Amino acid sequence: MQIDDTLLNKLEKLSALQINDEKREEIKKQLSEIVSFVDVLNELDLSSDEAVVSSIKGGTPLREDEPHLSNVVDEILKHAPSREGHFFAVPKIIE
């Protein structure tokens, strides 16, 4: 698949991005390389392969949830320039 200006404009609009004119050719080249790589992956014959969710027999081992006290809020708020209780204090911007 060739990435042309029309497709790049559509992608630019859908992604809400603005691409500089200097970067357009480079972006088109990179997108073409990505699409070519995906095309190669799509050509692989996987009909004889069985779908695998996990390579570990019995699935992924999970740890038990262990409740413990956390000091994360205080750790984060100690770097705040201003705080009120467990909240950041910021200037009022909406009346």
From Swiss-Prot:
Record organism: Campylobacter concisus (strain 13826)
E.C. no: 6.3.5.-
Keyword ATP-binding on entry: yes
GO molecular function: asparaginyl-tRNA synthase (glutamine-hydrolyzing) activity; ATP binding; glutaminyl-tRNA synthase (glutamine-hydrolyzing) activity
Gene Ontology terms describing biological process: glutaminyl-tRNAGln biosynthesis via transamidation; regulation of translational fidelity; translation
Keyword set, alphabetical order: ATP-binding, Ligase, Nucleotide-binding, Protein biosynthesis
InterPro entries: Asp/Glu-ADT_sf_sub_c, GatC
Quaternary organization: Heterotrimer of A, B and C subunits.
Catalyses which reaction(s): L-glutamyl-tRNA(Gln) + L-glutamine + ATP + H2O = L-glutaminyl-tRNA(Gln) + L-glutamate + ADP + phosphate + H(+); L-aspartyl-tRNA(Asn) + L-glutamine + ATP + H2O = L-asparaginyl-tRNA(Asn) + L-glutamate + ADP + phosphate + 2 H(+)
Function: Allows the formation of correctly charged Asn-tRNA(Asn) or Gln-tRNA(Gln) through the transamidation of misacylated Asp-tRNA(Asn) or Glu-tRNA(Gln) in organisms which lack either or both of asparaginyl-tRNA or glutaminyl-tRNA synthetases. The reaction takes place in the presence of glutamine and ATP through an activated phospho-Asp-tRNA(Asn) or phospho-Glu-tRNA(Gln).
Protein name: Aspartyl/glutamyl-tRNA(Asn/Gln) amidotransferase subunit C
Lineage top rank: taxon: Bacteria
Pfam families in UniProt: GatC (PF02686)
Record bears the keyword ATP-binding: yes
Gene3D superfamilies referenced in this protein's UniProt entry, alphabetically: Glu-tRNAGln amidotransferase C subunit, N-terminal domain
Similarity annotation: Belongs to the GatC family.
